[in-house]
Regions:
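Membrane-embedded alpha-helical bundles of polytopic integral membrane proteins
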Residues: 1-153
């Protein structure tokens, strides 16, 4: 009992230290950390959903979609790309929907629903951290990284 508590406490402290360190270090570390966390969280969600037996979502495509959504919103927020950066994400979502129809799976509509849920429930909140982290100053035409706002969440 005591050993398990100690192991969990040390793991928790390390996890918090990595998150805080990456957020405070620089924008690249922030992006790398949260794109990884987003993709792995979607992978775990897909694993849990697929265990039910009724649903079979494509974990690889949903992971790629979640990671790309984070990177696209990050690129848009730092003014590295325009709104056209979201076109590959839309193509990926359309591919996901069309592929479910032709793969002859048990419940294609339920698979769509859980795939979209993973994008909206997991990937989108992580991606919205970029909106908090990067402030655009139109007068100086620059973007600044503010680690305090994502850290406050």
């Amino acid at each position: 009992m005591k050993n398990n508590f100690l192991q969990r406490a040390i793991t928790g402290i390390l996890f918090v230290a990595i998150i805080v360190g990456c957020i405070l270090y620089d924008p690249l570390a922030f992006g790398t950390l949260f794109v990884t966390v987003s993709a792995l969280t979607i992978r775990e969600f897909g694993h849990l959903v697929n265990q039910s037996g009724e649903v079979s979502i494509n974990r690889t495509i949903t992971m790629l979609g979640g990671a790309y959504l984070f990177l696209a919103i990050m690129g848009f927020c730092i003014d590295a790309a325009g709104s056209k950066i979201f076109i590959p994400y839309l193509i990926l979502i359309i591919y996901l929907m069309v592929s479910e129809l032709y793969l002859k799976k048990k419940n294609p509509v339920l698979n769509w629903a859980y795939s979209m849920l993973s994008q909206m429930y997991i990937a989108l909140p992580f991606a919205m951290l970029n909106v908090l982290a990067f402030q655009n100053d139109p007068e100086a035409s620059s973007v600044s990284y503010n680690p305090i706002l994502p850290l406050s969440i």
